[in-house]
A protein has these predicted regions:
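Acidic/histidine metal-binding catalytic segments
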Residues: 53-61, 98-112
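Amphipathic alpha-helical segments within well-ordered protein domains
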Residues: 42, 46, 88, 92-96
Length: 230
């Protein structure tokens, strides 16, 4: 990858994400997190590209820019769903200035546009590179940091035990469904399933802990498939 291209892309991404107009609780830390996430997605994308044999630099650049659409002033949840399409529009002239061909720019922008909800507002091809933008985003969103963030977002520590149990079960069911989600490449599929399996194991262990956090009360059973304690 060309260092000059990467450095220019870094500066552009940082300038756009620093705006973060979407977040009402905008703080320097919120912007910093979004930048950190973008870097992780870029590294994941480059790893996928290297394993699959397509352009690492363009994949890295597209992934690094995937969330710059957050810099606009949004009014509702639909605007949030559009942030990939908005990001593609912001990225297009910048990518052209970097010297990429028209076809290369469109492929990268298509990947940025579809990474949220698999839809774009312009025609494009679902190439491995384009699909990798969304795949890399999802892979990072289901890694270790989001375990912490997911529990923090529901104030898990302060939930009553019954609600903690219910939350764990809901998450486990959802993760089992998400594990079947198709990815654009074999490498992304492997990485995705590894992340989901990691979370499933965490929530299996957490579920065991919350189930054993009180004395059995229904027929002397800790678990539905256990014999009553004597």
């Amino acid at each position: 990858m060309r260092e000059e291209i990467i450095k220019k892309t870094e500066r552009f991404m940082q300038a756009e994400i620093s705006k973060l107009a979407f977040f009402q609780d905008n703080t320097p830390r919120m912007a910093q997190y979004r930048m950190e996430h973008s870097y992780r997605v870029a590294h994941i994308g480059a790893e996928i590209a290297a394993a699959e044999g397509f352009d690492r630099e363009r994949t890295f650049v597209a992934c690094l820019l995937h969330d710059i659409g957050y810099s606009l002033d949004y009014r509702d949840k639909q605007d949030y769903r559009n942030h990939g399409r908005y990001g593609a529009a912001i990225a297009r002239p910048f990518l052209t200035e970097l010297g990429y061909s028209g076809a290369e720019v469109e492929e990268m922008c298509y990947g940025i546009a579809i990474h949220v909800d698999d839809m774009a507002d312009f025609e494009g091809e679902r190439t491995p590179l384009a699909l990798t933008v969304g795949d890399a985003d999802n892979i990072d969103r289901f890694d270790a940091y989001r375990l912490y963030e997911g529990l923090q977002n529901v104030d898990y520590m302060n939930l009553p035990l019954r609600e903690q149990k219910a939350h764990v079960e809901r998450v486990r069911q959802r993760l089992a469904e998400l594990r079947q989600m198709p990815c654009g490449t074999a490498t992304a599929t492997r990485m995705w399933q590894e992340k989901i399996d990691y979370q499933l194991e965490f929530y299996r262990r957490l579920g065991h802990q919350v189930q054993t956090s009180t004395w059995p009360s229904e027929g002397g059973k800790c678990f539905p498939d256990e014999k009553p304690l004597l």
